[in-house]
Every structure is written in structure tokens, then in C-alpha cells.
């Protein structure tokens, strides 16, 4: 009921405010009704009678001063002039006249000279200088307002009615004015004269207050201000504005951005900002209402912008003020240990109370209890945890590296996002276990005694072992740079706590571990320690090193001098040498071969942006709609209209707010890269906008968007020859990039854009990607934070970060597979780690459904493990051109298509000639059946003749792809039956 009453009251307040704001206010300048003494206006007449001032009664029987005149002859003018009336800033005023007029037919006078009208004039003046003769009693210098006619006339025996007329004067510009009345043959009485002007009253609307405003023109702009507890957003906002009409009424709605401050809500129809009551809050500025405090929070006063958490409840630093307060979780339940010698698997159940949060994690604290009765101490660094000791997401942890026959106390603690805010420690559940006495203890204290160029002498502490005598030590050492590959690790045994590792590589780092063996068997390896062999055999070689350094420095100085001389000579003759020129930092090698310039090689990366990208004025760009979002910000469609050029659509990448200087440089680096490329299959850079916020990159607009989603939307709608045409365009663009020595690093169908003519263009030239290590699902991460799945990346790029044009060729093979499968995800739902393992074991993607055999073989060529065996992009473009000229070859397809349940192709052990009876069988076994007719026409009709083939023979047969050459020669060489050693594969 109370809420209903408040709403009704608010309605009437709003209605009253609206009505008051829409009614004009009148300010009276003169009113003869209110005068209590004689008016003493000036009269002028050349003949009798004159205007006569008399006292009379108005309609309410109040005594008023009036003027009257009744002329018998209308040939002369009779004037009546008021005193000076101050205009008080008004540019136009209104004159309200109350008068009576006698009908001519009721008078005993000549009808032709009798009139039933009179004239109204005014005269402006800055001083009150009017006299009996000045200004002259004539129409000029007076300004005529109107000839006033009576609506009601007095006649004998008739009803007495008063005429009321309101006339407008203006425009007025001087200090004041005089009113003048001219009667010519009229019989009338001027009962009252009221002079006033209209003004817009003070108004409150849309949380803005506007002052009383006098209109000085057709519309007068009024500047207001926000109501109390309201403000406008932004550093320098424009004040509220509204227009006052000449009729004294406000025109339309105000132009304002006033909103209530945090802790206040709009009330009474946006007439005021009212403080939020206790128990309610409003966290930001705006016209929205106050909200009830989130769960477990409260306010202690009115006008609160945030609710304070109740005792025992907290908010994480990342939580916003409108989220509920939460508390730390209760302890994990029922920890269950599984002890295996000196290792432990610990599992537990989740807490009964998660604290109201979903970011639950666990930590494990380990304490070793050496002797009964003494306090337990924290475990040493030799204890290992999987997946980790802290931040565990699951409810299971494996622990190893424990000492045998030792009691440990493990505490499993539950934490969430507000555990750090709590003054109490995390709740935990403790369990005690004792390890087996039969396992040797860990070996510790491994250190180096001496080191040479090819050996390391190491020793370690003898473990304290009371149960079994240590029989032997085993040493495991691996080259650090080669990781834990089986062929890089070696083992040695030692009967004492010292060992000499010999036959080591010079200046190489080794990772060494030691474990002990007793009658109970081997224990666990101790902590891995790194040691490095020396670069020289002994210290006596130091003089040779110094001599070598001096020689190298001398040669370097000589090279610098020669280079400077060559530079000066070429600079003098530069106009004569068309083969080598330098323009805008892009070096032309030979005849028109442009080389890509890395923008990060500039001392100031902004210089590269200015050099390769054109700055566009923001007024030339109109953003129409948001079409996507990326790691940098939003992607929009817009129009670009440059004076003198045709308007066209563009794609606009914007940099999201809150960026760092490095993120801005990385964002604009893509523009300085794109600006160097001019090719029909490379996305074209229109320009950049850096002079205003947000920073933008403008490129040509591609109507069909990304290739992968476009293919999925049009699954099965394109013929093989159309798909080959798309692939040919992508390969042509990549050929152009490779010729400029640019490595893309992220070639995938999602980064290929398609226009309305199905032309495919390579895009996304972001840089600075690095590999996230120590992850079960490794991904490349760009500098702006976006993750790139590695299933498009060549194995050498994953393992050694070796990005080359050959690694781009591998990625192109994956793009081919995406195109022929109409946007299928490569390797389907396999994890990234499974993909890495499969590729390392020489498994490859099978052909997509209805994929031409020739195209799948080209994919396999791109996926050669040895990067030097992969075709170049020039070879790929040539091969696809042949397919387009001979579309019949596209009709030969694989027997079965790929799918999530289809196994990967095993490329590890191709069939050898010995298992095949004919040349055709052998070629089909190694997936080279396309060359069967070529072999037979050249006379290779038996396997005996095939075994004599070498590289030169393959070239004569027209087999030029390096991958095909290697596969054929490797199959022959595998049996050791080749009489002539094959030549090197030609690249």
C-alpha cells in the first residue's frame, strides 16, 4: 500500500511539473488597473475635445483610471501617449487593451466622419525625453502596431460589453518605449492598458535544471545544470541545453547527459536524484534504480555505492561490487592414501560447503615426522607432486621422492578465490602415513669435482640406510639440449659415491641423476642437477683463444672498412644501377624482387608504421556494424570515403581499451607488415587511424568472411575444380610471401578470407607468437593473448621453434585438407598432445570424402617429416595449374573418406619392392601409382630394372617433386638392392 501511495504521489508531481513547465510566465511592465493615482499621460489635439482622464469602476467594481474621448468630427487626430515603459530585456512585448466603443448609428453625428476604430503606435527611446512636441505627433517617427476595431459596440438600450484586444510589439532594442493611441472620429473609452512580456519559467526535467529564460528571438537557447547528486560523464561534457520559444513555452525535450551519481537513483520522473535507502545500493552512474544488496552483504547508510560483506564473507579482488559475498570452503572430506614404497597417491572428496564459489582448488602440505614426540617439519624440495602441490583442480595427487621407513603427515586444504582475504588459514584434513622400509633412500648432494672438455667427475652424499646395505649406484645423464630422447640419455654404474663420465661432448650441458640399489632393488632417482663440460681441453689454450679473438676482431674491422667503401661507391653511382635500389626500406634485389622488412628491426617501430601504412582521417570512415571480435578488440564493417575516390566498404579492426604500449605496437605491426604486400591473393591494407581513439586498421572488406566457416555453410556446394581454384589462389599468395622471405607462421583456413567472387586472400599477419611450455595441450600464444592450436603447425616448429617457408608448406597441406573436407576440424576431437604424438610416429590425415587422389598425395608431400623434402610454393602452384588444365584427373578419388572414426594413415613402413610382383603393384604400395604409365613408357617393366634408378633417372622421367623423389628412392634403398647410389634429391 505504501509503494502504491508513493507511485501515485510521484505521478501527480510529474504531471504538475509538466503542466507548469509548458505554461508561459508573464512579467508585467505596466498595468493601469493597479495605478492608485492619476496616470497623467500626454495628450495632443488640434481641436476639442481631447482625451480625458476619468475615474471609473472595473468589472469587479474596483476604482480604476481610464481615458475617454467622443469626437463629433473625424477630420482631426486626437493623440494619447503613455509614460516611458522599461522593456527589462524583452525583445517583444504584448499590449492588452480593455475598451468600449459607441456605435456610429447611435450617435448624432455625420456618419462619414464617424469611426469605430483607433490606431495603436509605439516609439522606442533610450532616455525619457518625450515632451509635448517631441516626438512629432504623426505616424513617423512612431511605429504603427495596428488599427484596432471593436468587436462589441455600445448602442442605446443595448448590452454593455467590453472589448479585449492583445497586440504584439517588437522587435524592441532600446531601453524603453512609449505607447500612443490615435482616435479619429471615434467615441470610445480606454478602460485599462496592460503591457507584459512572456518568458519560459524555471524548469526541472531529465535530471537537469534550467533557469527562467526570456526569449530574445524565435527560439532562445537556455543552458542548465545537473540536479543535486547528478553529473555528466566524461572529462569535459557539454552542459544541458533546452530551447525557449518566443511564446514563453519550452520547446521539445532537453539535450542532456545528466545521470545520478553512484548511490543515487532517479526519482519523481527524473526530477531529482534520491539516495539509495539502507539495504540498497547503486554501483555506477546512470538512470537505473537502486538494487538490493547481493547475498551476504549489507549497507549501513543511505546513498551507498557498494554493499559491505557481512562478517566472515569476502569478495575476491576480481569480483565486482554487484556480486554476492562468499566465504572460504570447508575442509576436504575423507582423504584416502595409497602407499607404494616411497610414493603415495592421495584422493579425497569435495568439501560439504564450497563457500558459494566455483573456483575451488586444493593444496597439499607435507610434513616429515622423523622421531616420535618431536614436531614434524616441512618436507624438503626432493618431494615431488603431480600435477602440482598447489592450485590442484582435481581431487587426486601423486607424491613421490619420500624417504623409506618414515612417517609423514599430509594435510589436504581446500581454497577458493576469497581464501586469501580470510584472516584464518584454509580448512584442511590431515592424514598420517608411513613409507616402506625396504626401499633405498634418495641420493642427495650431487656435485662436481672436476670437469674437462670431454668428461665430468661427480660425487654425492652416501645415504643413511639402516635396513639394507647399498650395493651399487646407477647414474643417468642426458644432453640438456636434446631433452629426454632415448638416444641422448646414458646410464652408468658405480660401486661408491663417485663417478667419472667420459666421452662427453665439448661445451655441452648435461642433466644428471643418481639412485641407489639394495637387496630390495633400485630406489627412485634423485633430483636432476645440471653440469657443463669445458669448451677447451685445459687452461693452456687461453693464449690461443686471445689470439683467435684478436684475429677475428681484425678481420671484422677490415670487413667494415671494405663495406663502407663499397657503400660510398654505390651511393655515388646509385642512379646508374637499376638492379639495386632502396625505396621506403624495401630492398629490391635483382629485377623487381621486393624483400620483406621486419618492422621490429626498426629502432622506433612507429617509424615502420609511418613508412608502410597510410594514415587516414577519421572523418573519412563511417562504422556501420560490428561483425566479429578478436584478441585485439572488435572487427567492424564500415565505409571509407576519401575525397576524389569512390566510396567502398572496408573491414575495420579496433584496438580494445586499456592496452599497453607494447600491445599497441604489436597491433600496428600487422599494418606495417600488410602495407608491404601488393598481391591479388593477399589482403589489401587501406590505411590506419592512430590520431584518435580507438586505434584502427582498415583493410578491404571480404564479403564471405573466413574460409573455414564459409565452407561449412556451403558444405558440398562447390565442385572439385572450384575448390582447386581456391587452393591455387592461396598457394599463389603464399608463393608471393615466400619470395619476399616472409614466414606467415599461422596459415589456416580461419585466416583465409573470401570475397564475393570466391577469391581467397591470406590475412592475419600478427607477430611475436611463443610456445606455452609445461602444458598438456601446448599452444602458440600471440602477443595480444590469443591462442593458436598447434595442429596446423609443422613438427620442427613445435619442437625447436624453427619457422620457415617449409613450415608454412606444412600448414598449407592442412589448409588443403580443410578445404577438401568443407571446413572439417583437422584431427577432429583428438587432443593437441595426441596430434603431436601421432605426427611423431609418422601418422597423417586420411583423404577427406570424395577427395581426388592427386590432391591427397600433394597433402602428404606437404607433410613430409623432413622439411627439405617438402615442395616449395612455386611447385604447388605449378602442380595445381596442371590439375586445372586437366580436370579429368580430379575424378580419381580415394576409396573411403575421412571421418572422426577413420584411422590416421600410417606412413612409417611403406611396402618395399620385394613384396610386390610388378612395377604397378610396387608404385601403388608406396602411393605413387600416378607414375605407373610413365615408368612403363620409359621401359621400366620389371622390378630388376627399377632397382637401378637414381635421381637423374627420375628427373628424366619428369618426377621433379622432391618428396616424390625421396619416397621412391627410399623404398628402393630400403632393401639394399640398389646397384648405383642415388644422387642427392634436387630441391
From Swiss-Prot:
**Catalytic site:** 746 (proton acceptor)
How does a null allele present?
A: Morpholino knockdown of the protein results in marked vascular anomalies of the dorsal cranial vessels including both dorsal longitudinal and mesencephalic veins.
Q: Specify the SAM domain's residue ranges.
A: 914-978
Supply the EC number(s): 2.7.10.1
Identify the residues that the record assigns to the Protein kinase domain, covering every copy. Answer: 621-884
Q: Residues annotated as region Disordered?
A: 319-340
The protein's location, in the record's own words, is:
Cell membrane
- The residues forming the signal peptide are 1-24
Q: Which part of the chain is the Fibronectin type-III domain?
A: 328-438, 442-536
Could you tell me where the Pro residues compositional bias lies?
A: 326-335
* Recorded topology in the membrane: Single-pass type I membrane protein
Disulfide bond annotation, renumbered to this chain: 70-187, 104-114
Entry protein name: Ephrin type-B receptor 4a
What PANTHER family does the database record attribute to this sequence?
EPH RECEPTOR A5 (PTHR46877), RECEPTOR PROTEIN-TYROSINE KINASE (PTHR46877:SF19)
Q: Which residues lie on this side of the membrane: Extracellular?
A: 25-548
Q: Which GO terms describe its cellular component?
A: plasma membrane; receptor complex
PROSITE patterns in the record: EGF_2, EPH_LBD, FN3, PROTEIN_KINASE_ATP, PROTEIN_KINASE_DOM, PROTEIN_KINASE_TYR, RECEPTOR_TYR_KIN_V_2, SAM_DOMAIN
List the InterPro entries hit by this protein, alphabetically. EPH-B4_SAM (IPR037636), Eph_TM (IPR027936), EphB4_rcpt_lig-bd (IPR034290), Ephrin_rcpt_lig-bd_dom (IPR001090), Ephrin_rcpt_TKs (IPR050449), FN3_dom (IPR003961), FN3_sf (IPR036116), Galactose-bd-like_sf (IPR008979)
GO biological process per UniProt: angioblast cell migration involved in selective angioblast sprouting; blood vessel development; convergent extension; ephrin receptor signaling pathway; lymph vessel development; venous blood vessel morphogenesis
- Any idea what job this protein has? Receptor tyrosine kinase which binds promiscuously transmembrane ephrin-B family ligands residing on adjacent cells, leading to contact-dependent bidirectional signaling into neighboring cells. The signaling pathway downstream of the receptor is referred to as forward signaling while the signaling pathway downstream of the ephrin ligand is referred to as reverse signaling.
Per the record, the similarity remark reads: Belongs to the protein kinase superfamily. Tyr protein kinase family. Ephrin receptor subfamily.
Asked if Membrane is a keyword of the record, the answer is yes
The protein's GO terms of the molecular function aspect are: ATP binding; ephrin receptor activity; transmembrane receptor protein tyrosine kinase activity
Q: Which organism is it from?
A: Danio rerio (Zebrafish)
UniProt keyword list: ATP-binding, Cell membrane, Disulfide bond, Kinase, Membrane, Nucleotide-binding, Receptor, Repeat, Signal, Transferase, Transmembrane, Transmembrane helix, Tyrosine-protein kinase
Q: Is Repeat found in the keyword set?
A: yes
Topological domains annotated Cytoplasmic: 570-987
